[in-house]
Amino acid sequence: DMTLQSRLFEQQLAFAQRYQKPVILHLKGREKEALEYLRHYENRYLVHWYSCDAWLQEYIDLGCWFTVGPSLPFDEAVQHVAACVPLDRMLVETDGISACTWCENRKVAPKEHGAILKRSMHKISEIRNISYEKLQEQMVLNCEKFIGQRFPF
């Protein structure tokens, strides 16, 4: 029931805004509808593995953060996101074993996650014309900034 889902989504956004908690969004197929709600609740939003050309600029203009998923090397839509999103609001993710298995079209072992993240980082370096080392530094800063906590290393 979309009416119930919409009402609950709005309640969650209001709760997160009230208590200043970031919101992680999986928007696949509901990008336009979610955007309308987000405009009413100022907050920190992280858009998980966005791959839609439509409304990308609107999400950027709202100050949203974005993750780039493991399909980056093969998916032009995700490459477009990696090219357009401000570098200081981007994070890299694997989205877990099943997502990596889906992207790779084969069974992926947990020990491969590091290599998959590195491959995505190299692709972002290429797309953004930035050194891998500089990008690593930026991703650490981004993560610290988004969660509001410094890492002890």
Explain the meaning of each model-derived region:
Residues 50-51, 70-75, 95-98:
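Short, acidic/turn-prone active-site loops that include or flank metal/cofactor-
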Residues 88-110:
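Short acidic/histidine-rich active-site segments
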Residues 77-87:
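Short amphipathic alpha-helices and their capping/turn segments at secondary-structure boundaries
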Residues 63-67:
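Short, basic, glycine/proline-bearing loop/turn elements
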Residues 14-18, 114-153:
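Mid-to-C-terminal alpha-helical segments outside catalytic/metal-binding sites
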Residues 1-62, 73, 80, 129-130:
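Divalent metal-binding pocket/active-site signature
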